Amino acid sequence: MIALTEQRKEELSSLENLDADLEELARQSKKALEALQATALKLTTSRQEAAARYDKAVSDILHTLGMPKAIFETSIETQMLSPNGADKIEFTLAPNPGEGFKSLQKAVSGGELSRVLLSIKSVMADLDRVPLLIFDEVDSGISGEVGNSIGEALKNLGQHHQVLTITHLHQVASRAKNQLAVSKEEIEGRTYTHVVELDHDGRIKELSRMLGGESDTIREHARQLLEV
Protein backbone atom coordinates (compact mmCIF):
# COMPACT_ATOMS: atom_id res chain seq x y z
CA MET A 1 0.00 0.00 0.00
CA ILE A 2 2.86 2.35 0.86
CA ALA A 3 4.60 1.55 -2.43
CA LEU A 4 1.42 2.25 -4.40
CA THR A 5 1.01 5.58 -2.62
CA GLU A 6 4.56 6.61 -3.53
CA GLN A 7 3.97 5.63 -7.14
CA ARG A 8 0.84 7.76 -7.33
CA LYS A 9 2.73 10.70 -5.80
CA GLU A 10 5.39 10.41 -8.49
CA GLU A 11 2.76 10.26 -11.24
CA LEU A 12 1.01 13.32 -9.81
CA SER A 13 4.32 15.19 -9.65
CA SER A 14 4.98 14.33 -13.28
CA LEU A 15 1.59 15.69 -14.29
CA GLU A 16 2.22 18.87 -12.33
CA ASN A 17 5.54 19.34 -14.20
CA LEU A 18 4.02 18.63 -17.62
CA ASP A 19 3.38 22.28 -18.44
CA ALA A 20 6.96 23.16 -17.53
CA ASP A 21 8.26 20.32 -19.70
CA LEU A 22 6.15 21.46 -22.64
CA GLU A 23 7.41 25.01 -22.25
CA GLU A 24 11.01 23.75 -22.24
CA LEU A 25 10.42 21.65 -25.35
CA ALA A 26 8.82 24.65 -27.09
CA ARG A 27 11.82 26.80 -26.14
CA GLN A 28 14.26 24.20 -27.48
CA SER A 29 12.21 23.80 -30.67
CA LYS A 30 12.17 27.57 -31.25
CA LYS A 31 15.92 27.78 -30.65
CA ALA A 32 16.56 24.93 -33.10
CA LEU A 33 14.33 26.56 -35.74
CA GLU A 34 16.14 29.89 -35.37
CA ALA A 35 19.49 28.13 -35.77
CA LEU A 36 18.18 26.31 -38.84
CA GLN A 37 16.89 29.53 -40.40
CA ALA A 38 20.21 31.27 -39.75
CA THR A 39 22.10 28.41 -41.39
CA ALA A 40 19.70 28.42 -44.36
CA LEU A 41 20.23 32.18 -44.77
CA LYS A 42 24.01 31.69 -44.83
CA LEU A 43 23.56 28.95 -47.44
CA THR A 44 21.36 31.24 -49.55
CA THR A 45 23.95 34.03 -49.38
CA SER A 46 26.73 31.63 -50.38
CA ARG A 47 24.65 30.33 -53.27
CA GLN A 48 23.90 33.85 -54.51
CA GLU A 49 27.59 34.80 -54.43
CA ALA A 50 28.64 31.57 -56.17
CA ALA A 51 25.84 31.91 -58.75
CA ALA A 52 27.07 35.35 -59.83
CA ARG A 53 30.54 33.96 -60.60
CA TYR A 54 29.15 30.76 -62.11
CA ASP A 55 26.68 32.55 -64.38
CA LYS A 56 29.39 34.82 -65.78
CA ALA A 57 31.75 31.90 -66.42
CA VAL A 58 29.08 29.89 -68.26
CA SER A 59 27.94 32.95 -70.26
CA ASP A 60 31.52 33.76 -71.28
CA ILE A 61 31.97 30.27 -72.74
CA LEU A 62 28.59 30.42 -74.49
CA HIS A 63 29.75 33.59 -76.25
CA THR A 64 32.52 31.59 -77.93
CA LEU A 65 30.15 28.80 -79.00
CA GLY A 66 27.94 30.67 -81.45
CA MET A 67 25.70 32.36 -78.86
CA PRO A 68 27.41 35.77 -78.53
CA LYS A 69 24.50 37.54 -76.82
CA ALA A 70 23.28 34.70 -74.61
CA ILE A 71 22.95 35.23 -70.87
CA PHE A 72 22.93 32.28 -68.48
CA GLU A 73 21.34 32.93 -65.11
CA THR A 74 20.78 30.86 -61.98
CA SER A 75 17.35 31.64 -60.54
CA ILE A 76 17.22 31.41 -56.72
CA GLU A 77 13.79 31.78 -55.13
CA THR A 78 12.72 31.36 -51.51
CA GLN A 79 10.68 28.31 -50.59
CA MET A 80 9.83 26.32 -47.46
CA LEU A 81 12.75 24.91 -45.52
CA SER A 82 13.90 21.48 -46.67
CA PRO A 83 17.02 19.33 -46.19
CA ASN A 84 18.51 21.35 -49.09
CA GLY A 85 17.88 24.75 -47.53
CA ALA A 86 15.23 27.39 -48.25
CA ASP A 87 15.95 27.90 -51.95
CA LYS A 88 14.34 26.78 -55.19
CA ILE A 89 17.12 26.77 -57.80
CA GLU A 90 16.63 26.72 -61.56
CA PHE A 91 19.02 27.28 -64.47
CA THR A 92 17.67 29.68 -67.10
CA LEU A 93 18.83 31.13 -70.42
CA ALA A 94 18.10 34.25 -72.47
CA PRO A 95 19.46 33.16 -75.88
CA ASN A 96 19.11 36.56 -77.59
CA PRO A 97 18.59 40.23 -76.67
CA GLY A 98 14.95 41.04 -75.99
CA GLU A 99 14.05 37.46 -75.11
CA GLY A 100 13.08 36.59 -71.58
CA PHE A 101 14.83 33.93 -69.55
CA LYS A 102 13.71 30.40 -70.36
CA SER A 103 13.98 27.33 -68.17
CA LEU A 104 16.53 24.89 -69.56
CA GLN A 105 14.01 22.11 -68.91
CA LYS A 106 11.18 23.65 -70.91
CA ALA A 107 11.89 26.11 -73.70
CA VAL A 108 15.45 25.74 -74.97
CA SER A 109 16.20 24.05 -78.32
CA GLY A 110 18.32 20.92 -78.54
CA GLY A 111 21.30 22.76 -80.01
CA GLU A 112 21.12 25.52 -77.40
CA LEU A 113 20.81 23.00 -74.59
CA SER A 114 23.83 21.07 -75.83
CA ARG A 115 25.94 24.23 -75.91
CA VAL A 116 24.75 25.27 -72.45
CA LEU A 117 25.61 21.80 -71.14
CA LEU A 118 29.03 22.00 -72.81
CA SER A 119 29.63 25.38 -71.16
CA ILE A 120 28.49 24.13 -67.74
CA LYS A 121 30.62 21.01 -67.96
CA SER A 122 33.63 23.08 -69.07
CA VAL A 123 33.26 25.31 -66.00
CA MET A 124 32.82 22.29 -63.70
CA ALA A 125 35.40 20.03 -65.37
CA ASP A 126 37.74 19.83 -62.39
CA LEU A 127 34.93 19.00 -59.93
CA ASP A 128 32.42 16.95 -61.92
CA ARG A 129 33.40 13.31 -62.33
CA VAL A 130 30.49 12.02 -64.43
CA PRO A 131 32.28 9.37 -66.54
CA LEU A 132 30.39 9.75 -69.85
CA LEU A 133 28.94 12.83 -71.57
CA ILE A 134 26.92 12.70 -74.80
CA PHE A 135 26.41 15.77 -77.01
CA ASP A 136 23.94 15.79 -79.89
CA GLU A 137 23.40 18.84 -82.14
CA VAL A 138 26.00 20.81 -80.19
CA ASP A 139 27.20 22.22 -83.53
CA SER A 140 23.74 22.78 -85.01
CA GLY A 141 23.61 25.80 -87.32
CA ILE A 142 27.23 26.89 -86.90
CA SER A 143 30.49 26.70 -88.82
CA GLY A 144 33.85 28.39 -89.18
CA GLU A 145 35.65 29.74 -86.15
CA VAL A 146 32.77 28.88 -83.81
CA GLY A 147 33.14 25.26 -84.91
CA ASN A 148 36.80 25.42 -83.93
CA SER A 149 35.83 26.77 -80.51
CA ILE A 150 33.32 23.97 -79.96
CA GLY A 151 35.83 21.37 -81.09
CA GLU A 152 38.46 22.73 -78.72
CA ALA A 153 36.00 22.87 -75.81
CA LEU A 154 35.00 19.24 -76.39
CA LYS A 155 38.63 18.20 -76.66
CA ASN A 156 39.46 19.89 -73.35
CA LEU A 157 36.43 18.29 -71.73
CA GLY A 158 37.67 14.92 -72.93
CA GLN A 159 40.63 15.25 -70.56
CA HIS A 160 38.22 14.78 -67.63
CA HIS A 161 35.42 12.66 -69.13
CA GLN A 162 34.67 10.25 -71.93
CA VAL A 163 32.86 12.44 -74.46
CA LEU A 164 30.64 11.07 -77.23
CA THR A 165 29.66 13.68 -79.83
CA ILE A 166 27.42 13.39 -82.88
CA THR A 167 28.70 15.95 -85.36
CA HIS A 168 28.70 17.02 -89.00
CA LEU A 169 31.58 19.49 -88.56
CA HIS A 170 35.12 18.60 -89.54
CA GLN A 171 36.40 21.05 -86.90
CA VAL A 172 34.80 18.90 -84.21
CA ALA A 173 35.47 15.46 -85.68
CA SER A 174 39.16 16.17 -86.29
CA ARG A 175 39.77 16.85 -82.60
CA ALA A 176 38.45 13.48 -81.46
CA LYS A 177 40.76 10.74 -80.25
CA ASN A 178 38.60 8.12 -81.97
CA GLN A 179 36.18 8.64 -84.84
CA LEU A 180 33.24 6.51 -85.95
CA ALA A 181 31.43 6.88 -89.28
CA VAL A 182 27.68 6.26 -89.24
CA SER A 183 25.84 5.50 -92.48
CA LYS A 184 22.45 4.15 -93.53
CA GLU A 185 21.68 1.64 -96.25
CA GLU A 186 18.37 0.42 -97.63
CA ILE A 187 18.22 -3.29 -98.42
CA GLU A 188 15.03 -4.88 -99.74
CA GLY A 189 12.86 -2.12 -98.33
CA ARG A 190 14.50 -2.04 -94.90
CA THR A 191 16.93 0.58 -93.62
CA TYR A 192 20.08 -0.57 -91.86
CA THR A 193 22.51 1.58 -89.90
CA HIS A 194 26.23 0.85 -90.08
CA VAL A 195 28.85 2.10 -87.62
CA VAL A 196 32.52 1.77 -88.54
CA GLU A 197 35.54 2.79 -86.46
CA LEU A 198 37.94 4.67 -88.70
CA ASP A 199 41.70 4.22 -88.83
CA HIS A 200 44.01 7.11 -89.73
CA ASP A 201 43.50 6.80 -93.49
CA GLY A 202 39.78 6.33 -92.96
CA ARG A 203 39.63 9.51 -90.94
CA ILE A 204 41.41 11.46 -93.68
CA LYS A 205 38.88 10.16 -96.22
CA GLU A 206 35.89 10.96 -93.98
CA LEU A 207 37.18 14.42 -93.07
CA SER A 208 37.74 15.11 -96.77
CA ARG A 209 34.13 14.18 -97.43
CA MET A 210 33.01 16.50 -94.62
CA LEU A 211 35.14 19.25 -96.16
CA GLY A 212 33.33 18.83 -99.47
CA GLY A 213 35.52 16.68 -101.70
CA GLU A 214 38.48 14.35 -102.09
CA SER A 215 40.98 16.38 -104.11
CA ASP A 216 44.64 16.25 -103.15
CA THR A 217 44.37 19.73 -101.63
CA ILE A 218 41.38 18.79 -99.49
CA ARG A 219 43.00 15.51 -98.40
CA GLU A 220 46.10 17.43 -97.37
CA HIS A 221 43.94 19.83 -95.38
CA ALA A 222 42.25 16.86 -93.68
CA ARG A 223 45.64 15.36 -92.85
CA GLN A 224 46.76 18.65 -91.31
CA LEU A 225 43.60 18.84 -89.20
CA LEU A 226 44.49 15.53 -87.57
CA GLU A 227 47.93 16.86 -86.69
CA VAL A 228 46.64 19.93 -84.83
Predicted regions and their residues:
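Long, charged, glycine-rich C-terminal linkers/tails
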Residues: 63-82, 87
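C-terminal lobe/lid and adjacent interdomain/linker elements of RecA-like ASCE P-loop ATPase modules
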Residues: 145-228
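Conserved ABC ATPase signature
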Residues: 81-118, 140-144, 197
